[in-house]
């Protein structure tokens, strides 16, 4: 098996085991047995079991369709911004509460961000925010960068709350309401 294929196999197998048995109920040894590799081979490709989560969240941009980045015909910038964030939330919900909670714990220990920043997503959201401000859909005068950072922190916060209450809230609706309030979205933009 090629080096890249081994790492891919470890990651794919790990996620399947985590989904089936829960993150804490799966050991590195079980991952190795399922992949038919030795522990030294595992550690040659990954630093730790926790490191597996980083790879899963680094791939978050693969869940955003290429078409979303092409928005030349868009007139409701607010709506397009929410679509982008809803793709991220879909990924979070697909991961599930168990793995997303573990991701929070790992990132708190390592003092890193929960969601890996994807440059293309960042740039597109900032462009859409500026266009939305110019169109009068977003009334908050803060810079697009500031509003982007607010949005990402809101997403982390609502994601953490979703984990704490075991998914008994509507993560999508609550996030969009919070984002709308933060951006001071013009009421008409909600109905286009």
For the regions a language model picked out, list residue spans one by one.
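Basic, helix-initiating cap at the start of DNA-binding domains
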Residues: 1-21, 25-37, 51
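Short secondary-structure transition hinges
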Residues: 89-126
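Hydrophobic alpha-helical connector segments
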Residues: 55, 66-94, 147-151
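Residue-level detection of the helix-turn-helix DNA-binding "recognition helix"
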Residues: 33, 47-48, 58
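Short hydrophobic/aromatic patch on the recognition helix
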Residues: 35-46
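C-terminal peripheral helix-coil segments that are non-catalytic and often amphipathic
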Residues: 83, 90, 123, 127-135, ...
């Amino acid at each position: 098996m090629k080096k890249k294929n081994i790492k891919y196999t470890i990651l794919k197998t790990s996620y399947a085991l985590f989904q089936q048995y829960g993150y804490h109920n799966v050991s590195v040894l079980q991952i190795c047995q399922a992949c038919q590799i030795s522990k030294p081979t595992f550690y040659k490709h990954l630093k730790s079991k926790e490191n597996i989560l980083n790879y899963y969240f680094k791939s978050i941009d693969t869940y955003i369709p290429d078409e979303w980045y092409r928005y030349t015909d868009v007139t409701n910038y607010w709506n397009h911004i929410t679509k982008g964030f809803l793709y991220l939330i879909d990924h979070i919900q697909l991961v599930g509460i168990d793995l997303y909670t573990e991701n929070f714990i790992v990132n708190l220990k390592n003092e890193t961000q929960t969601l890996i920043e994807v440059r293309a997503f960042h740039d597109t959201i900032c462009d859409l925010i500026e266009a939305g401000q110019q169109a009068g859909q977003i009334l908050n005068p803060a810079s697009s960068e500031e509003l982007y950072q607010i949005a990402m922190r809101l997403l982390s916060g609502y994601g953490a709350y979703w984990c704490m209450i075991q998914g008994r809230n509507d993560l999508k609706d609550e996030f969009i309401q919070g984002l709308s309030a933060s951006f001071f979205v013009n009421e008409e933009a909600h109905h286009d």
